[in-house]
Amino acid sequence: VVVSSCGFDSLLDYYGGNLKGYVQERYMLSMGEFVNNAAAVPWDYYELIACLAPRLVYVNAPVRDANFRWDSVDRIASAARPVFALHGSPENLLIRHPDCEHDFPDNERMEAYEWIARGLQWTSDPTRLPPKEPVR
């Protein structure tokens, strides 16, 4: 299970292709060689998201996020969804667009928790937990 909140858009869309925001120790310092040439980066997020198929992937992409464009996320999802479909699970890529800025609103956060629980087959009712397999 993967959950992303305000986490990505196409490198070409990110601040018009200026990758300076990525070039920090806490993110991807090695992107420095591409700072002014996003088109030269040998990957983009549609490929990374496609690689997650068939896992459950929940993406919160707010419509008023100043860092990451929601419509770019939709283009990425459109490009990645056929790979999910090849695995028989196009519905496993779920995109949400709350009307807010760079935030993870409570409704989407709770839905993401449910998505995680579904993916992990977790329940708060111990009588509904799947039986443990013996350790070998």
What residue spans do the PLM features occupy?
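Mobile cap/lid helix-loop segments that gate and shape the active-site cleft of serine hydrolases
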Residues: 1-48, 67-77, 85-89
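Alpha/beta-hydrolase-fold serine-hydrolase catalytic core, especially in secreted/extracellular enzymes
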Residues: 45-47, 53-136
